[in-house]
Amino acid sequence: MNTPQISLYEPGTILTVGSHHAKIIKYLTSGGFAQVYTAEISPPDPYSNANIACLKRVIVPHKQGLNTLRAEVDAMKLLRNNKHVVSYIDSHAARSVNGIAYEVFVLMEFCERGGLIDFMNTRLQNRLQESEILEIMSQTVQGITAMHALQPPLIHRDIKIENVLISHDGLYKVCDFGSVSGVIRPPRNTQEFNYVQHDILTNTTAQYRSPEMIDLYRGLPIDEKSDIWALGVFLYKICYYTTPFEKSGEAGILHARYQYPSFPQYSDRLKNLIRLMLMEAPSQRPNICQVLEEVSRLQNKPCPIRNFYLLRAMNQNANTQLAGEPSSTTYVPTQKFIPVQSLQSINQPPNMMPVTHVSTTPNLGTFPISINDNNKTEVTAHAGLQVGSHSNLTSPLMKTKSVPLSDEFASLYYKELHPFQKSQTFKSVESFQSPQRKSMPPLSLTPVNNDIFDRVSAINRPNNYVDSETQTIDNMAVPNLKLSPTITSKSLSSTKEIAAPDNINGSKIVRSLSSKLKKVITGESRGNSPIKSRQNTGDSIRSAFGKLRHGFTGNSVNNSRSASFDNNNVNGNGNNTNRRLVSSSTSSFPKFNSDTKRKEESDKNQRLEKRRSMPPSILSDFDQHERNNSRTGSRDYYRSHSPVKKTQASAKTTSKPTLIPDNGNVNINQEKKESIQRRVHNLLKSSDDPVTYKSASGYGKYTDIGTETSNRHSSVRITPITEEKFKKTLKDGVLDIKTKSNGKDKSRPPRPPPKPLHLRTEIQKIRNFSRLQSKKLPIERISSEATETIVDVNVDDLEADFRKRFPSKV
């Protein structure tokens, strides 16, 4: 609908606005549907005691537009009497004179020094100093803080240079609340999407829009973090007199890509503040309280406003404790602690403040923090107040994340960025979920549950086993229980006992174990060695390990193995059957002395002499081993796994040694015994066959050998060359090639005539001359089929050539 043509008020016109009478003094400006005048009011404004006010006249084409004006008026009423917000005085709405529209009159505070943009235009040559910029930013942020502190919060959505005014006493005030709204949740259907998109395009300025405003498909709410983005653009513009996305446009906004001009130059901390406020992800931007705190630090002034997020969290937690509702207690010092004052004595403990992750909802327990006149943060704890932590950090109304100051932003408390560090990135919000515990804060707090310390100690506890008696709750004990090297991991996992023999000292253990081990491995005689047979059926190895276990445990081979860790018997008496395995700084066994070494050497020599004197009889070895230990089960295993099939007993069977069982446990079958003997003799007979040697002949690069029908193991058969064949080869100058597939000779095509002398090259002439001199065969590659023909080779020449080429190998 077209804007209705309404004439301007003449100076001196008297209007009634609510309970005030306004007399028009001067017309100031107009834009869109609004006209702005200065007027003299009566009675005067009780807040400022001024009788000069600003009269805003708005033409509303239809009744639906009255809701927008009503929202603006309500917002100004909520922010009344804030020194950094243009104060509301009175308002009135009525039908226009022509009756086709509505007129809304709003009386508000008059700022005599005009707008911020007018002040900036006076400093085009002499740009603003950093101190001036920080002062403008501080007062503007205080005005926005008043909006975000409301419950539910108000979002300005149109923060820009043109909407900041300067009062007669030099205060900067935020104005134009026509775009104010609550938190806008992400649209869930097409209708909501179109409505939100139209609302953003109507009530926001393009260069100040945040990425979540431009790209609604991201599904992010439009909340206080959108105002933080606009404040970042605002700060950039008062520094450089242009917006950061003037050239790149929406593409730069969506990915937060911009550059800092080289002139004018400002501190890195100020640039870093801009960078933090212009983070692409809303969760990585600081909240309004953190922005104000950082600006105050840059000014070296105390923060003028207390962090209402922390106050709400403290009050909510206190109410929860008073009501007797259970609250989860957590170990609070897992957060990073940042010193408030940058210059402090080393010997004096600094004042620390935990940077906790809070939201706009009073749903997070933390310390009540107050800032006194000395710019020191005081952390107080009420009696009986337990510090709680809630995982759901949600912003008001929309239950969305609102993560405060991150690690990079918090670093501005006590240090500045490197001059070249201009593109430092933020950690995502997920990085704040489970911070690691660093140290206890120097604070006097109420007790925390002991379960917290148990959980923390369990996290840092080593993986190896620690006895319950050696572990205390005060300090992390070093495991004093180390497993013996003779215990395998399999036995440990089965948690069975290893019974140690009684009254065995270190030297006896050494001697017994070493003798047992050597008996098993080498054997005092061939008959005693269970792993020396020529055909190992598997039971010999099994019996060898049975011997090893018998030597280590002192029990029978068939006894069950177990590892017992007796936590009660710690006196270390020698009579205890089950001993606790305790590690020490020294070895469990003493070192070998010279006597032991000499004894072992003599035993070794005796065993070798015995083995040399005894005949190599596998049957005698087998029988002797079965007599010594009848529980190995090697005979049954050998019979069941032998590859030799059972046959009739032959009359030619040789000597039949008798196997004598122990204690009648094994009944010997005569037929099976003969079968065993026959198989063993067959093996011995086969071992007497001459050893076949395999050569590497025939493995040349160009040698192709067909399948041989002979039983020879050599893969290549070379036919000896005869003198007649050699002379024939020299005469013809061609190698006769015979194929093994058909047995017929293949005749080669006739040799081409020699090349005329005038066409031959020098190299060919030299080669032909050398051939004539040496009378050798031409140098040709022997085909792969010429395996039965040997070329004449001078061995002496080859040997001389080899010595010349490889002198080190001769």
From Swiss-Prot:
GO terms for molecular function: ATP binding; protein kinase activity; protein serine kinase activity; protein serine/threonine kinase activity. The modification Phosphothreonine is found at residue 553. Residues 22-298 form the Protein kinase domain. Its main location: cytoplasm. Present with 1323 molecules/cell in log phase SD medium. It comes from Saccharomyces cerevisiae (strain ATCC 204508 / S288c) (Baker's yeast). Residues 553-566 have a biased composition (Polar residues). Coiled coil: none annotated. Residues 594-612, 622-639, 733-748 have a biased composition (Basic and acidic residues). This is Actin-regulating kinase PRK1.
